[in-house]
């Protein structure tokens, strides 16, 4: 319908109050993961002459990434979920590994075919590696305020509030969040200004040898 994903999610959450905060976060994560992997999720159905729709994408996503904890056959007819899976759809999904093995490279790596030449020219030998990274959620990095604290103390403080981080070998002031990012804004470390969200690339810019205390940087 042309509505942005953010707007569609906002409207859905507004009209479906039964979805709590954890549910809303999980739904958002799944929706954006599906969008990143959209081409490969639809491909098995595309070559079987299906039209793309949200239901097909979700069924494919659940089958590929959630079948260890969830069975599509458990879906029953109700107003809160997808209609039960059809036999033909299940047959397609059961053969999904065979379809994926034969999929074109742009489908596997999730990019438009017409961009392949330019992407390979730009990325060179890193092409496959970079495109695979784009299929996953971007990592979340924190910058430590070294004037107020240090990496070790803040890593420990964050863990006490269920925010698990790891050190980043590329930066002396960065932590990478592994889990618990939903607790960050209410954490004491964030509220006190000991940490803030900042991309790793921006942090590395300030750590080059030519930069010294007191200098101003245009990021």
Language model: regions and residue ranges:
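Glycine-rich helix-loop-beta junction characteristic of Rossmann-like nucleotide cofactor-binding loops
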Residues: 187-188, 207-213
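Conserved class I S-adenosyl-L-methionine
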Residues: 214-219
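Active-site-adjacent "gating/activation" loops or surface patches in catalytic cores
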Residues: 179-182, 195, 213
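Class I Rossmann-like S-adenosyl-L-methionine
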Residues: 1-186
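Conserved hydrophobic/aromatic pocket- or pore-lining residues that grip, position, or stack substrates
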Residues: 142, 197, 205
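Class I SAM-dependent methyltransferase Rossmann-like catalytic core
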Residues: 188-196
